A protein has these predicted regions:
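Structured-RNA-binding interfaces characteristic of tRNA pseudouridine synthases
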Residues: 4-230
Length: 231
């Protein structure tokens, strides 16, 4: 094993995926995950046992434009060519955007200083087929300005205990949110127009379901169900 370690190199992958058909990133006893698919594909392709480590353990149904992951391997394939070699082996809803060699002590969870999550909403009376898998439908009009104002109360270092799922196992519920943006773009016109509302949350790390609960809270503010003083 010591002899084998001499030839080991660490590779960094940037992974994009559509999370619709996956039970999140992290391997689960019941249900297929992105991590499991990558481990099996890499192990089969490189003919050695691979265990990948991801920066963000995204929840079930969450998509990613660029989750950073690393693995160790003896492969002699040029690092920048790995993405092109691996992508044909992967299902169409997972793609390696880039690949490179990194120092052996590089760890995506500790080197990663910032994460950004987006929560997409279709705001309109008629559900659009193109949005059904990727947006939460809200049929009543949202007050975007109120949502923007409310979001700023959550920026900074706070105890987010009331903004995480009950099964959170984190040692502390204090987290730092560095920015929240709420923006709206037109989706469709006519008698029943629709707009896309995007809630973009950036921070150093998040609790289980924290971004979903923040988004749900801001939706309640936008609907007038919750006032700013309750944030």
């Amino acid at each position: 094993d010591r002899e084998r370690m001499r030839f080991m190199k660490r590779f960094k992958l940037v992974v994009a995926y559509d999370g619709t058909n996956y039970c999140g990133w992290q391997i689960q006893p019941n249900g297929i995950t992105v991590e499991e698919v990558l481990n099996k594909t890499l192990s089969r392709f490189l003919k050695e046992e691979i265990h990948i480590i991801g920066a963000s353990r995204t929840d079930s149904g969450v998509h990613s434009f660029g989750n950073v992951a690393v693995f160790d391997s003896e492969t002699t394939i040029p690092p920048e060519k790995l993405c092109f070699a691996l992508n044909p082996q992967l299902p169409e809803d997972i793609r390696i955007v880039s690949s490179e060699q990194v120092p052996g002590d590089f760890h995506p969870r500790y080197c990663d200083t910032r994460k950004t999550y987006e929560y997409h909403i279709q705001n309109g009376k008629i559900p659009l087929p193109t949005e059904r898998l990727y947006s939460h439908l809200v049929i009543f009009p949202l007050n975007i300005q109120a949502m923007q104002e409310a979001s700023q109360y959550l920026v900074g270092t706070h105890d987010f205990k009331s903004f995480c799922a009950a099964k959170t196992q984190a040692q502390t519920t204090v987290r730092t949110v560095t920015g929240i943006e709420v923006e709206a773009h037109p989706l469709s016109e006519g008698e029943y127009p629709s707009k896309k509302v995007i809630i973009r949350v950036t921070g150093e790390g998040f609790l289980y379901n924290m971004v979903r609960i923040i988004s749900g809270t801001l939706i309640k503010v936008g609907l007038g169900v919750l006032s700013l003083i309750h944030i």
